[in-house]
């Protein structure tokens, strides 16, 4: 039943012509040099059967990050994968892997595309499926785990569980008067230099 779907694959390689400062620094005397190539590489594969079933994988490497060597022996710096199904009996949607969650007009959480204030005062209500598959190369604004939405008549129930590591600045207290703490979360997704990789 799901064999006659549509396959799509995207491979994109881009590079800024000018060499960034991180490539020009002497690696023997500094730690903030970029050990990887200046190319940014994106790979995306997706299979979609109607609007009922899809799966896909995304791999992304930022400029300056290593590729299949050094800190990145597994290839891309970021991987994302998902399996997503809709309309299976009372199961309205089932997400396995990476997905987004959209609740409460964004007051609770809203990870899909959403517009804010505009001249159109009537268009203030956000509408989207509660669970959606994640196809992007962004490394922070999604959930990784399992989610399910059950629907019967006018009732709808959504349950999801998610666990993923995120980048953060960890500050160790040297005076022993305080506990170690996290000073900030990193949303850039860069892992080029030694300090970025340690975050």
Located regions from the model:
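Active-site metal-binding loops of divalent metal-dependent hydrolases
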Residues: 99
């Amino acid at each position: 039943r799901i064999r006659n779907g549509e396959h799509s694959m995207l491979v994109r390689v881009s590079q800024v012509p000018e060499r960034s400062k991180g490539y020009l620094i002497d690696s023997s005397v500094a730690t903030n040099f970029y050990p990887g190539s200046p190319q940014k590489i994106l790979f995306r594969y997706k299979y979609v059967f109607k609007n009922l079933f899809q799966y896909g994988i995304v791999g992304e490497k930022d400029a300056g990050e290593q590729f299949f060597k050094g800190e990145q022996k597994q290839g891309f710096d970021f991987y994302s994968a998902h399996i997503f199904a809709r309309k299976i009996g009372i199961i309205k949607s089932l997400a396995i892997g990476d997905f987004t969650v959209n609740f409460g007009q964004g007051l609770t959480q809203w990870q899909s595309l959403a517009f804010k204030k505009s001249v159109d005062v009537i268009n203030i209500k956000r509408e989207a499926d509660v669970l959606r598959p994640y196809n992007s190369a962004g490394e922070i604004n999604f959930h990784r785990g399992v989610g399910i939405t059950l629907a019967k008549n006018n009732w709808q129930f959504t349950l999801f569980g998610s666990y993923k590591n995120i980048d953060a600045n960890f500050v160790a207290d040297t005076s022993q008067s305080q506990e170690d703490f996290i000073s900030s979360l990193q949303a850039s997704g860069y892992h080029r230099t030694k300090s970025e990789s340690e975050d």
